[in-house]
Amino acid sequence: EIVVTYTYETIPGDEFSLGNAQVTVVGPVKSYAEPNNTSIVMRVAFGSTVFLFTGDMETEAENDMLDYWGDKMDWKADVLKVGHHCSNTSTGYRFLNEVMPEYGVISLGKDNSYGHPHAEPLSRLRQAGTVILRTDELGTIQAVSDGKTVTFTWENQGANPENAETAAQTVFIGNQKSRKFHSPDCANLPAEKNSVEFSSYQAAIDAG
């Protein structure tokens, strides 16, 4: 038996079909010394549902992708495969603000030596109102799209995803000087005279 293997170097904008789904390669958009930033990023669209896979890409390359595509790419996704096992080097605010996923799936081992998932990206996902599904809690996770909605099943029936409804309704505190916003429990809240309240994460984003 002879096995022939072909390799193909992708470039941003490459498209191919996967059954009835359309796959678009959206990154990386340049070369990097850091191997994690060379992860292939794929946008998978099936019907009106969208999945985004970012591999181990870090915030530097996330931001470069946003700059490269500008307004030519719709980053909104129903499901985000959270970058780098939910490391604090990935899933930055700017990138997450564009994607605004309904669901975030985190692949990681239980009690891993890296401390994943890190608190910072978890906080960002919660602030965005994302429902978080973790393999260390749920076991194997399967997402199924019918082209209109995405449904999930998981191995550990005794566990449930983290429901983000409360996070989506949290009041956020904006700093009128720095133009940044914080969750109410942040240790770096602005002085009262410089603060402004937003009723939701999206309201804070819309205010710039």
Residue ranges and their predicted role:
Residues 155-156, 160-208:
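Mature, structured domains enriched in cysteine- and short glycine motifs
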Residues 1-168:
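Non-globular, low-confidence helical/coil segments that flank catalytic cores
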